[in-house]
Curated annotation (Swiss-Prot):
Name of this protein: Cytotoxin 4a
Stored InterPro entries: Cytotoxin_Cobra, Snake_3FTx, Snake_toxin-like_sf, Snake_toxin_con_site, Toxin_cobra-type
Keywords noted in UniProt: Cardiotoxin, Cytolysis, Disulfide bond, Membrane, Secreted, Signal, Target cell membrane, Target membrane, Toxin
Function: Shows cytolytic activity on many different cells by forming pore in lipid membranes. In vivo, increases heart rate or kills the animal by cardiac arrest. In addition, it binds to heparin with high affinity, interacts with Kv channel-interacting protein 1 (KCNIP1) in a calcium-independent manner, and binds to integrin alpha-V/beta-3 (ITGAV/ITGB3) with moderate affinity.
Lineage of the organism: Eukaryota, Metazoa, Chordata, Craniata, Vertebrata
Amino acid sequence: MKTLLLTLVVVTIVCLDLGYTLKCNKLVPLFYKTCPAGKNLCYKMFMVAMPKVPVKRGCIDVCPKSSLLVKYVCCNTDRCN
């Protein structure tokens, strides 16, 4: 009986995928934040003139369009930014 109960709990957790959340780097990549519901992309923003220096990183729901001055790079896996 205990085995059956344990099996049901494990199957429920696997099927519902409880607790899956995306993790995105903050400005300093050593630190990250767990994204709230609905924000399913990580992003990195930097100035086009200085592409090696990110200005901002975090979670976002829709990837913004880049402009002549600012470029956005978006991705959807943990700590990919």
